[in-house]
Design a protein with these regions (language model features):
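C-terminal assembly and membrane-engagement modules of membrane-active proteins
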Residues: 1-88, 116-228
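Membrane-active amphipathic alpha-helices enriched in small hydrophobic residues
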Residues: 92, 98, 102-118
Length: 228
């Protein structure tokens, strides 16, 4: 079990767990993740149209804002008979595989993200209906105590209407076209200045985008970790 405390934030289409001890750099992480999403939207179009291209632009925008990407991965999981998908659980499993001590906090995050009240914020960034098909894109990440980032994303298409899809929706069988999986890990450049960080925050305030960052509060670990 992690003794570190974590809070949960919504940043556009990303749900981010943030370690308490990473607080000095928290605002810049939130700002730069949101900026990178908006930047890729502008340069590469919707994440729902060409997710691979959009994600590449998203990662590049993070690099331009001082994040050094130390690891990245892409994969495509084909649909197979009998397999199912719960989007947020799949992302959580990927993060937990690298950071087992986060299991209780990740379970708590899943509980929060599955609540109906969350969908009003999440839906514009995660779901889009086009020609009787719902295009879905989710990302779950963590800012660790050393202020490094671990991010996992996925995209898929579903015949279900957007109103019937949530991060915890059980999809069986797997979407016919499979699942596009992405992951990135990064650390902040040591050359990033306070003025640089403040400048980005001021930009998001001027352009009225700061409302797309929402603090969901402190996570209370669930499951076995809650009493460990």
């Amino acid at each position: 079990m992690s003794k570190e405390g974590y809070s949960l934030w919504l940043v556009g289409g990303t749900a981010l767990l943030v370690a308490d001890t990473a607080q000095p750099l928290r605002q810049y992480a939130l700002d730069s993740i949101l900026f990178a999403q908006l930047r890729s939207d502008k340069l590469n179009g919707s994440r729902f149209t060409r997710y691979g291209r959009w994600y590449s632009g998203y990662r590049t925008a993070l690099e331009e804002r001082g994040w050094v990407i130390v690891r990245s991965r892409s994969d495509h999981q084909q649909s197979q008979v009998g397999q199912s998908l719960v989007p947020v659980q799949r992302l959580s499993d990927d993060l937990q595989a690298r950071h087992p001590s986060l299991s209780g906090h990740l379970r708590a995050a899943i509980t929060q993200l599955s609540q109906g009240a969350m969908q009003q914020h999440l839906q514009p960034f995660t779901l889009a209906e086009q020609d009787k098909t719902t295009h879905c894109a989710y990302e779950l990440g963590v800012m660790l105590p050393d202020a490094s980032l671990e991010m996992c994303g996925l995209a898929f298409k579903s015949a279900l209407p957007a109103s019937q899809i949530r991060p915890d929706t059980h999809l069986q069988p797997l979407p016919a076209e499979g699942i596009d999986l992405r992951a990135s890990a990064g650390t902040l450049s040591e050359y990033l200045t306070v003025a640089h960080r403040q400048g980005l925050h001021d930009l998001l305030e001027r352009t009225q985008h700061v409302g797309k960052i929402i603090d969901l509060g402190v996570l209370k670990p669930e499951g076995d970790d809650a009493t460990a």
